Amino acid sequence: MKLFGFGSRRGQTAQGSIDHVYTGSGYRIRDSELQKIHRAAVKGDAAEVERCLARRSGDLDALDKQHRTALHLACASGHVQVVTLLVNRKCQIDVCDKENRTPLIQAVHCQEEACAVILLEHGANPNLKDIYGNTALHYAVYSESTSLAEKLLSHGAHIEALDKDNNTPLLFAIICKKEKMVEFLLKRKASSHAVDRLRRSALMLAVYYDSPGIVNILLKQNIDVFAQDMCGRDAEDYAISHHLTKIQQQILEHKKKILKKEKSDVGSSDESAVSIFHELRVDSLPASDDKDLNVATKQCVPEKVSEPLPGSSHEKGNRIVNGQGEGPPAKHPSLKPSTEVEDPAVKGAVQRKNVQTLRAEQALPVASEEEQERHERSEKKQPQVKEGNNTNKSEKIQLSENICDSTSSAAAGRLTQQRKIGKTYPQQFPKKLKEEHDRCTLKQENEEKTNVNMLYKKNREELERKEKQYKKEVEAKQLEPTVQSLEMKSKTARNTPNRDFHNHEEMKGLMDENCILKADIAILRQEICTMKNDNLEKENKYLKDIKIVKETNAALEKYIKLNEEMITETAFRYQQELNDLKAENTRLNAELLKEKESKKRLEADIESYQSRLAAAISKHSESVKTERNLKLALERTRDVSVQVEMSSAISKVKDENEFLTEQLSETQIKFNALKDKFRKTRDSLRKKSLALETVQNDLSQTQQQTQEMKEMYQNAEAKVNNSTGKWNCVEERICHLQRENAWLVQQLDDVHQKEDHKEIVTNIQRGFIESGKKDLVLEEKSKKLMNECDHLKESLFQYEREKTEGVVSIKEDKYFQTSRKKI
């Protein structure tokens, strides 16, 4: 997702997150998500779009699965004809997709300027925002299209629109390092004083993202260089923390120009204030001011100060008050003060004080005896003066050390705060780079600490060196009074007559000098008090800033801990879900193996049933053939017997009767044998029919799953029942014929016993022949029934095979559906 945080050094990871949102050539289009009108809009087929609208006018604003209309897809693909067609049909122009992007935003995102112009001319709103809070102008800034931005602004786009990170298009152009767009937006009067969520100004962001060209443009626009963010850091602090010396020099030069302008404006008022102090007289100050000067200065100066002290003027004032102001100190390149007084009023007072001391030295008369005594007293007081100077200088050295310590600690604290606030804020880095970023921040903090320690050591060495130089200077000043006393003695010897005149002039010069010094002392005291108040205010401000930074650090640490806990919880939850899925996968695999085994077993059972059925059918056909052959043989034997009987003579009736009785007995035996075989075959058929019924019952249990095949099965079963009924009728008729045959046999027996005439025999034979014909008719009917039974069995077998295939396919479909639902 989009994160406009500034987490990496000069915005590298933030730039990557921005690119993730703003780059891309359009939508990811899947054909399954689109309707016909959407496919035509993607292809740019205006004729097909018009046909779709003619068929169904409701497709004009139809949405796909990603909530995109045909206008969205046409704008993303840059098809101007389709866009004009849809707009002329008065479709919804400001409809939003799943990312809350309008067709105008999508056209600007894909840099389709012609489509964007058509939408703007037909009243598209350029100030609508997507889910990231970006307007069409933000996307135009990213693509660095000034023409698109110009058209958006001319159609009412808000130039100060804010995204989710409170970035205006100008700030966003600075983040993306789009120098051309920065110049364009500033020409269109975009506000250069806008700030983001962390209250960072445009200049701070330009420094942060290492854009010296943009910094130069902003400085030309007279941007506020002294503006501060939430943590109290300005643009120069950003340049120092990121080691950007070039940008730091640009900012310093701009600050110097601003200070020069302010000094030129304030100079006249400072000179008037100094002239008022020069008009002060000697009586306006108490006599104890000169004695208490050092004490007052010591009390006014705080122990730790962060502002520079007026060191040069303070030293000169001490020398003059302590009696060492007879001559100016020798200038040395190594003795330059480390801090300079920026106030022009104080500089003017110090310069005028030095001029007065020089004049007093030039106007000194030749010393008389009183002057010699005074010099002797001053020589006696010289060790005390030396001790005072030494104490003052040692205090100055300690004070400068405290200043160095405070500045170094403040710098280190500021850098660590900058690292903490600027680097651990949750929007600064992506979650994947968090550990690497923490390591980098620790390394940078350690480097900054080492740099601060090195600076402290260097400053300490410089202070020690300056202390030695001050000691040498004090020794030289101690020798100056002795030399001057000798010179004064020689001058007194030469100029004794003019002693009174020179004494009067000397007193007058000293009085004037005293007035000037008192005025300078008052100025310095007031300045010291103001500096003290400023330092106290700054200390309070720094303490408040430190508290705020500590609170923010604590909040950020809590946020980091919460994030870590959430990450661990989500990882644990995902691990549990993964384990559950693995277990379910193993269970499903086991079920699949069981299903495969059961399927194989059922297939084997079906094959065995098929083989058994085929064997039973073949046995049944063989038995029918044997029965048919037996019947034919019986008919042949009957025909032969009839022919023999007809050809035999009447005289041989007894022999023929005996022969017939023998034949009848033989045929009866054969008939009985055939009857037994018929019974056996019938029993076997019954068994096989029972087996078929069991198979049909098994099949009926499986057929309950499919409702459509049930009717066919019932019809087939009804036909089988009819055939079995017919078969039972045939059996009953066969039994009836057997009974008739038995009755005929009994009649033959009676004939043999009674020895009746041939007519009875012929009648019996005729009845036997008729019964044979009836048997043939019954056999034909039984053949037809057997054929019907075979046809029904074949249809049943085919039906069972189709049914098993359908059941297997249904089971497989159900299994895959259940497995998909579980997954």
Curated annotation (Swiss-Prot):
Pfam family, one: Ank
Coiled coil: 431-480, 565-724, 776-805
Positions of the UniProt region annotated as Disordered: 301-343, 355-402
PROSITE patterns noted in UniProt: ANK_REP_REGION, ANK_REPEAT
Entry-linked Gene3D superfamilies: Ankyrin repeat-containing domain
Bias (Basic and acidic residues) ranges: 372-384
Renumbered ranges of ANK repeats: 66-95, 99-128, 132-161, 165-194, 198-227
Keyword entries, A-Z: ANK repeat, Coiled coil, Repeat
Name of this chain's protein: Putative ankyrin repeat domain-containing protein 20A2
Gene name tied to this protein: ANKRD20A2P
